[in-house]
């Protein structure tokens, strides 16, 4: 069973600190140029106060780490990177390796620096933290980066939610994150919809893995795309479960929240299964497959 977009959703509301995210700071006169030469997104043209999804790739074009990059420049260039906490150390190490003689400073900000997310409520103002709109989806509200203790105090008790509310909203909007919905170095940017979310610049110069990604784009060879799946019986499934149609494996699911999950799946096999009227299941649980609202890639949903 499938449909091209989710049924109408209640308004997205969450307000919490994210324990599974960390921040890096890249500063210095050549910070924008340095990041632009490494990451998939256009960084040099990023306006102050704006953000963009991006990824660092292997030379073979696989995602090492996805991230949100924010231009926090004031008098001096400063870019803040919002990344999965489990990937932060490795990302910082890799950026340091590429720094060479570039006039940049790379800091892995410590646990005293937190990232909070707020949607459905006005984001609190303050001088000790940075506030950015989520560049992937306006419905996902704002992200605040600053002292963890201050951010915790800024969230009113009557608005506070747990992190599960954020992840349920993220999944319902079709926004995959490395480490939760796919493993590092397992997927190309197209396979996790980074190109659909504005995280791949196809008109800029070279970056690591650019040749593979560009070839996939211009030849239209991306057969795997990340889709939303909704458990029809309301149950959740553990991450890593196979999504199957009969004896065909469509993909491997990530973590589930709110009876939904994300699956990078073979859309050619999905189309064949739907055309044949085959039931689709994730970890043995029947699911409905939903194409994200933002998706522009072709897929025959039957």
Which functions belong to the PLM regions below?
Residues 14-25, 68-176:
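Acidic, low-complexity central loop/insert segments
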Residues 192-200, 214-302:
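Glycine-rich, small/acidic residue-mixed loop/short-helix segments
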Residues 163, 169-195, 232:
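Short, conserved active-site entrance elements at the starts or edges of catalytic domains
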Residues 30-35, 88-92, 123-126, 148-155, ...:
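Short, conserved charged micro-motifs
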Residues 42-43, 96-104, 155-165, 245-250, ...:
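A common structural junction motif
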Residues 55-60, 118-128, 233-246:
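Short amphipathic alpha-helix segments
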Residues 1-65, 73-74:
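Acidic, proline/glycine-enriched N-terminal capping motif
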